[in-house]
Amino acid sequence: KGYPIPERKGEDYQKFIRSMKALGYIFDCRELVAADYGAPTTRKRWYAVFRRDGKEIRWPEPTHSRENTGLQRWKECGDYIDWSDLGTSIFGRKKSLAEATQKRIANGIKKYIIDAPEPYIVKNKDALAFIIQYHGETRDGESRGQLLTEPIKTIDTSNRYGLVTAFITKYY
């Protein structure tokens, strides 16, 4: 009735690979992280390569890295946000945000701005920013989200993410 059979997991995949090899193809596969190749996302993807031209399969070398390893640093997702449109402020709303949402935002400000060693500073906006997920916390009760100084994590199509900007001002 369309349900997976755990004890037969991978059979169709192996059949497919055997069929391709029977046609004369060589095969290799691996999981690659997009950020290692210059994309501003940490999404992992499985890649398969089949060849039958007599040449060996060659994989690209990473061009970027999270650490300082001589490669370029991972791209920051904050560099790809249109900062000319910060959306609608939460402060002029007719209906207040739910208490849980307010708590998530406060926790996120603490985690990604106040306690962050290098928070993301929005250029020319006098603001600090981060992305928040507002459909739950971690097991430790911490806010889900991320700094904008990193490549973006996977964002699904649910309406459960927000860009939080905390404006900074000088007090004399």
What are these regions (language model features)?
Residues 1-159, 165-172:
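Class I S-adenosyl-L-methionine
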